């Protein structure tokens, strides 16, 4: 059974230990199919979100911060007037983990609201 974005968005991040290997290329490919508009960049996934104004951009960034705090998994965020770029990687393992995809799915779900 394939994982859907809704399945990913309902999962919780698990603590990542350095001994855990990064996801395989096959696992990454399968999980990327569940995300809309995210780009795979080797050891990271990234998406740019656009908004009408600075207030909406910052409201979204604050919501992402709340999700990140709850999941204890934090992205790199670049903010502009009416856009923001979110990039995930799991630094502890030097690559991508399921946690990156869980958080990306949660953010995508938030953006649809």
From Swiss-Prot:
One protein family per Pfam = Pterin_4a
Reactions catalysed: (4aS,6R)-4a-hydroxy-L-erythro-5,6,7,8-tetrahydrobiopterin = (6R)-L-erythro-6,7-dihydrobiopterin + H2O
Keyword rRNA processing recorded: no
Molecular-function GO term, any one: 4-alpha-hydroxytetrahydrobiopterin dehydratase activity
Q: Which residues form a coiled coil?
A: none
What biological processes does GO assign it?
tetrahydrobiopterin biosynthetic process
Q: Which residues cross the membrane?
A: none
Q: Sorted alphabetically, which keywords does the UniProt record give?
A: Lyase
Q: So what EC number does this one have? A: 4.2.1.96
Kindly give the Gene3D superfamilies that the UniProt entry links to this protein: Transcriptional coactivator/pterin dehydratase
Family to which the UniProt record says this protein belongs: Belongs to the pterin-4-alpha-carbinolamine dehydratase family.
NCBIfam families named among the record's database cross-references:
PRK00823.1-2, PRK00823.1-4
Q: What is this protein called?
A: Putative pterin-4-alpha-carbinolamine dehydratase
Q: Which organism is it from?
A: Nitrosospira multiformis (strain ATCC 25196 / NCIMB 11849 / C 71)
